[in-house]
Amino acid sequence: ASTEPLRAERADEILREYSPEDNERQLTKWVARVVNVFSLFISLFLVYTAAFGQLPAMQQRSLYLLCAMVILFLVYPAFSKHSKKGVAWYDYLFAAASFGCCLYAFVNYEDILLRFGISNSTDQFVFVILAVLILEGTRRLVSPALSLITLIFLVYAYFGNVMPGMFQTKAGGLTRMADHMFMIPEGIFGSPLGTAATYVSLFVLFSSLLQGCGMGDFIQDVALGLTGRSTGGPAKVAVISSAAFGTISGAAAANVVGTGTFTIPLMKKCGYPPEFAGAVEACASTGGQLIPPVMGAACFIMAEYIGVPYSEIMLAGLVPGFLYYMSVFVTVHLRSKKLGLNGMRSEEHTSEL
């Protein structure tokens, strides 16, 4: 087996296969410019509103959703096998429809609020189009299973008043669905989107800036210097670097690519069994979602729902995160002792640094 670090192309292939959010298509120059414009705009918008105050809830969330949906349909193909092709014609249509639906909510937010949850035919039309687009975006970026489950519940909400027995609801139909899922902040423009449009994206932006400044390489060098020559050193490097990388990235797949492309070949080079090297990196990278301050989007939604400051959620996550990585670290040490896996030799340690 090769012990050389993964090439960037191979790492991208692995991400596209196992992580839907990294299955990006190859963009032409002008499409890439459009995506960059929307990305820059929403980044500056989030920083501005964080510093000088947010827009009304529906405007803040609809503008954020507008940019996110346009970027999604231009960047992520409908199927992974199309990732090397250009943007399909229907994706331009989806991006334009997303732009129009979200712009409608942004411009008419006062009129929508003044109607107190009573939708008209235009609202219902926009709701249907936007709901379909969100389901398709979820299928591409998260999983088809989540879109299917959501679709089942939407169908149930529509036909609930004609369902038999205990499954029957008091009312159903498109009007009631639009009233609750589009006109008031309980559905599409609810608190999960509000959390993403305020806190989550700021932390993701901060994480991207740190990674772009070379923080990932610095973390690996520090971990290598601390534990590289101790018993089970290369595996401990994976644990420490993954824990530290988790503070700037809440995604397990990104953690694996950020640290595993270095630590897995290093462990194999030092005589570690390939399955042991892979298992250590998988466990260490998965735990990155437990480490503050990012901790994944679910943490921010949790803070929104239970009504406590995010700082308290973050502090509460310190102890479980520490215990998790301490247990992985001790397990690696004991397993390395049992297998007779020593640390790196001085010349290997110096060359890697």
Model-derived segments and spans:
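Residue-level recognition of pore/gate-forming positions within transmembrane alpha-helices
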Residues: 153-157, 243, 285, 304, ...
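Conserved, well-structured core domains of diverse proteins
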Residues: 1-114, 124-128
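Alpha-helical transmembrane segments
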Residues: 62-67, 194-204, 311-327
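Hydrophobic transmembrane alpha-helices of multi-pass solute/ion transporters
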Residues: 57, 83-86, 112-205, 351
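C-terminal ends of transmembrane helices
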Residues: 73-83, 134-139, 212-218
